[in-house]
Regions:
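N-terminal intrinsically disordered/low-complexity leader segments
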Residues: 1-22, 29
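C-terminal peripheral helix-coil segments that are non-catalytic and often amphipathic
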Residues: 1-11, 107, 111, 139, ...
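Helix-turn-helix
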Residues: 22, 26, 34-68, 72
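Hydrophobic/aromatic residues within well-ordered alpha-helical segments
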Residues: 23, 66, 73, 77, ...
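Amphipathic alpha-helical linker/stalk segments
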Residues: 71-100, 142, 148-150
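Hydrophobic alpha-helical connector segments
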Residues: 86-117, 163-170, 199-202
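Amphipathic alpha-helical segments used for helix-helix packing
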Residues: 110-132, 180-188
């Protein structure tokens, strides 16, 4: 008996699950791009299907409607934005934690600019889809992380800053490189942001925020 004789037979259901996950990811990535360029109103399931390279029927099969897909895209963007806050804990070194968070946000601005634009456009229209998430998940997380920052302030580990407004400042400073990249490029005289431009911007934001925090 060979070793391969002992290998379990491939599970068809497992394979189907992997295919579904791969297709859903393709569709979500395509939808992010289409929503960023056309907005919710201008986007169509046909355009998303074309961008994903999958039949339109598949897009409807996995997500049902444009509204469902849009909600899923927004929820995923918010989840990805909140994940980097894990480094902000009471026992963490304030300078390292804040720097790590800023660098993560700048990386997202570079790697997922379309996601940032979709979210910004949603907010500019009054957040009709994500308002509940903003008032619950986001508000609760910011409150808990602002409490961590306040504990650092109370312990004399950093300058006296308002933790909640610190997050607003970081979001504005990092997301501008995605949401307003056209403006940034125009002022810099470039057709697009180069790796050097992004690195310089990252170091600038890190330095500015850390100095403002007395770190």
């Amino acid at each position: 008996m060979s070793a391969t004789d002992l290998d379990p037979e491939p599970d068809p259901e497992s394979s189907k699950g992997q295919i579904r996950q791969a297709n859903e990811l393709l569709i979500l990535q395509a939808a992010e791009k289409v929503f960023a360029r056309a907005g919710f109103g201008g986007a169509t399931m046909a355009a998303i299907a074309t961008a994903s390279g999958l039949p339109k029927a598949n897009v409807h099969y996995y997500f049902g409607s444009k509204e469902v897909l849009y909600r899923q895209v927004l929820a995923q963007i918010l989840s990805d934005w909140l994940a980097p806050t894990r480094c902000i804990t009471v026992d963490a070194e304030p300078r390292l934690a804040i720097e790590q968070y800023i660098r993560a946000k700048m990386a997202l601005a570079k790697l997922r600019p379309d996601g940032s634009k979709v979210f910004a456009n949603e907010l500019l229209h009054g957040a009709p889809v994500v308002k509940a998430l903003l008032q619950t998940d986001l508000r609760d997380l910011v409150a808990s992380k602002a409490a961590v920052i306040q504990s650092w302030v109370n312990a004399g580990r950093m300058a006296r800053v308002n933790g909640t407004h610190l997050f607003f400042t970081i979001w504005a400073a990092t997301q501008t490189y995605a949401d307003f990249d056209v403006q940034v490029c125009a002022v810099l005289g470039n057709s697009s942001l180069s790796l050097e431009d992004h690195d310089e911007a990252t170091e600038h934001v890190v330095s500015l925020v850390l100095r403002g925090c007395g770190l």
